[in-house]
Amino acid sequence: MVPSTFLRSKPARCLPVLLATLIFAGCGTHTQDQSAAFMQGTSQANSSFYLQQMQQSTNDSKTNWQLLAIRALLQEGKKQQAIDLFNQLPANLNSTQAREQSLLAVEVKLAQNDYQAARNLLAKIDPTNLEQPQQARYWQAQIDASQGKPSLTLLRALIAQQPLLSDAKQRQKNIDATWQALTSMPQDQANALVINADENILQGWLDLQRMWFDNRNDPTLLKAGVKDWQTRYPQNPGAKMLPTALVNMQNYKPASINKIALFLPLNGQASIFGRTIQQGFEAAKNGAPSVTGSAVPAQVAQAANVSGNDDVVSPSQAEISDLTATGSRADPVQAPTQDQAAPAAEPAAQAPATSTTPQTTASPATQPVTAPAAQPQPVVATAANPSAELKIYDTTTQPISQLLAQAQQDGATLVVGPLLKENVEEVIKSNTPLNVLALNQPEKVESRANLCYFALSPEDEARDAARHIHQQGKQTPLLLVPRGALGDRVVSAFADEWLKLGGASVLQQRFGSTAELRAGVNGGGGIALSGTPVSTLPSAQNSILGSADEMPVSSGGSVDAAYILATPEQIAYIKPMIAMRNGSQSNVTLYASSRSAQGTAGPDFRLEMEGLQYSEIPMLAGSNPSLMQQALSAVRNDYSLARLYAMGADAWSLANHFTQMRQTPGFELNGNTGDLTANQDCVINRKLSWLKYQQGKIVPAS
């Protein structure tokens, strides 16, 4: 009996040890399985949870939680914490962890806005080796690294990502992004694309793009083309779920312009601007000559060289937004003097300063409008419509809300204006049901289905300059701008656009008055082509022109472009001072806004400005010589007012194409103030003409 008792007691004594071993083994397995499930993307949590699990784990499990925490921190916008944790990853990773680490390395570079490094890392990853959730992230990283620049790489990434998305909103976002890439691609680039024979989905998208290129300015043909495309490519993701922009096109109805209400200031400080815009608007309504072709100059610069322009005063010395900045008149550019302004107002003297009298004043005799050639190009002409009823409402007489109510009661179908920024903001607050083409842009744009924004402003010109300079392959631009609010606005607009284009840091340097610049020339100081990064410079800088030591160049490299915002008098000092400090053979290309353009420029000035590129509205660059002559005659050769005259003419064209601008993606109008397109908020963008001083002449900039 003793042996029997011994045998029974031995298992009994071992049982607690075995149970404990099984329990702990089970716990360890559960933890490992849990981190693996999160790694595979089947579960999600926030960074706090992952960090806590990481602290409580060891070995591979701890590394898994660390990788998950990095991913969550990046998603939560905690960039620096994610980078620090990423740098603490162990060197020895298993294959699963190594794949996740390689993807996180890309996402870290994207968080740092180091897009080139991200693209280099992506090139080393084979997406077929990734798990499906990782593949979706890989393709999103490819999309982000492209920075929205239309390319075959971007299109392929979007197409590859689409089937990996399960959420309907994400799929629609993907379809819309694909369409945005297609419609923002220049037609020459699209025509040069070469794809593989088995890329059926991409082929379908490119066929839709070609149809859109051919019919984008004809809503009826565009709608029919979309339906035909859906029939021919029924399995294309875009046919099953149309891009939002094309869905909106299915409901296209042209806006009526039988009764137009023109909201302008006809009294007070801005009246000269309001009356000049009115003149241009009425001239176009009654058949003024239309612009011929796009803003890209061919021989258009010749108009700027003719001797008949020798008595033209310097252009663009009075920007609209300088005068109409909300709640402030800080640093305004001087308006034309009374003897200059009066003649411009005389032709508009018939216009009543009340809000109730229809305007039927005919414009001066003009050439008939030339119809555009029948080709899939931007609209270049808008037919005259003298029978359209036009009423002028003086925005200085009543609150905007009352004028809008009066216009609606008068039967207006479209409002053009107001001009002042504060009045535009009042329109937004009013929630009017009328279609409104505002002639300025508020600080914060609100997207409304019945509202578009059309402004001539230094900011608008700065954005175009950023695009032009980036297109010329420049990497490190310096902004030479005046102290004060005007300089702040231009710097902000340029830098924002530069970042969108994928550029690195932008440098800036401020200067003072013309008298201070003159003193600098007399002192032999010169201007160093260096500056402080935009993100770190205070909004108001006290020094006139800092030394090279005071203005450190960013780590991105030496300056290769300088954009100058100055009057003709100021740039006459600035350019020689740049040469004085840097030598005339500097490799830095100089650019200027139209504010610097000199209608009275003689041979000496043109030689002094050798190599300088500057922007100009197409009308004053020579794209519409007849209207240019008419406008300059009306405003006594004041170029700044001639710009507003051109703006008025373009406002008429935009009014006639209001619905297309609002609803048709990629719709483009060749205007007197630029090639006009609208973004998704219906902010009208202008592509300007770029000219250059060369051997004493003005020629198109390459």
UniProtKB/Swiss-Prot annotation:
Residues 330-378 have a biased composition (Low complexity). One of its GO terms (biological process) is peptidoglycan biosynthetic process. InterPro entries: LpoA, Lytic_TGlycosylase_superhlx_U, Peripla_BP_I, TPR-like_helical_dom_sf. A lipid is attached at C27 (N-palmitoyl cysteine). A lipid is attached at C27 (S-diacylglycerol cysteine). It is a lipid-anchor. Keywords: Cell outer membrane, Cell shape, Lipoprotein, Membrane, Palmitate, Peptidoglycan synthesis, Signal. Residues 327-378 are annotated as: Disordered. GO terms for molecular function: enzyme regulator activity; hydrolase activity, hydrolyzing O-glycosyl compounds. Residues 1-26 form the signal peptide. Pfam families: LppC. GO terms for cellular component: periplasmic side of cell outer membrane; periplasmic space. CDD domains: PBP1_YraM_LppC_lipoprotein-like. It is found in: Cell outer membrane. Transmembrane segments: none annotated. Interacts with PBP1a. Regulator of peptidoglycan synthesis that is essential for the function of penicillin-binding protein 1A (PBP1a). This is Penicillin-binding protein activator LpoA. It comes from Klebsiella pneumoniae subsp. pneumoniae (strain ATCC 700721 / MGH 78578). The lineage of its organism: Bacteria, Pseudomonadati, Pseudomonadota, Gammaproteobacteria, Enterobacterales. The gene is lpoA.
